[in-house]
């Protein structure tokens, strides 16, 4: 780690079709082996399907799906006197988005549909309807934080 100065976070360029930084980040998370154009094709196709199903614009529908998956609290391990506690902590906004996107992509990859675009569209549709694997993951994380509320005073 550099000691001289704090290095700022890299600015991510907005995606070419919608001009959204959030969507550009989502494409980057979905991308495998540096194949960005393939990832973009998959995302845009999935968003088109999502927009048709929901009746909203692509970006609006994506935002709703993402909002339903964003976690507000998570647990972090904290070692105190020989025992490890799962301490609930609030999630920072940037990490909130990153986790939500990662969970959606993971859930889509585990689905059994034909193409990745269809799997992603189905997962986003489920997320928008507050169901599906990604939403379940968020609820599990929240449940874990709720169960360990007693250790909240170990925060750092």
From Swiss-Prot:
Keyword presence, Ribosomal protein: yes
Presence of the UniProt keyword Ribonucleoprotein in the record: yes
Coiled coil (UniProt feature): none
GO cellular component: small ribosomal subunit
Matching PROSITE patterns: RIBOSOMAL_S7
Function according to Swiss-Prot or TrEMBL: One of the primary rRNA binding proteins, it binds directly to 16S rRNA where it nucleates assembly of the head domain of the 30S subunit. Is located at the subunit interface close to the decoding center, probably blocks exit of the E-site tRNA.
Name this protein carries in UniProt: Small ribosomal subunit protein uS7
Organism: Citrobacter koseri (strain ATCC BAA-895 / CDC 4225-83 / SGSC4696)
């Amino acid at each position: 780690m550099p000691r001289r100065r704090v290095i700022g976070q890299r600015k991510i360029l907005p995606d070419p079709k919608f001009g959204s930084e959030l969507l550009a980040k989502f494409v980057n998370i979905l991308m495998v082996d540096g194949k960005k154009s393939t990832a973009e094709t998959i995302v845009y196709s999935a968003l088109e399907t999502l927009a048709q199903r929901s009746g909203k614009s692509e970006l609006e529908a994506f935002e709703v799906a993402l909002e339903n998956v964003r976690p507000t609290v998570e647990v972090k391990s904290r070692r105190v006197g020989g025992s490890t506690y799962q301490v609930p902590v609030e999630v920072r906004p940037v990490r909130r988005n990153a986790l939500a996107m990662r969970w959606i992509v993971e859930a889509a990859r585990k689905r059994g549909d034909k193409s990745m675009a269809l799997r992603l569209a189905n997962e986003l549709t489920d997320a928008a309807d507050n169901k599906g694997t990604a939403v379940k993951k968020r609820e599990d994380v929240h449940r874990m934080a709720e169960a360990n509320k007693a250790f909240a005073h170990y925060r750092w």
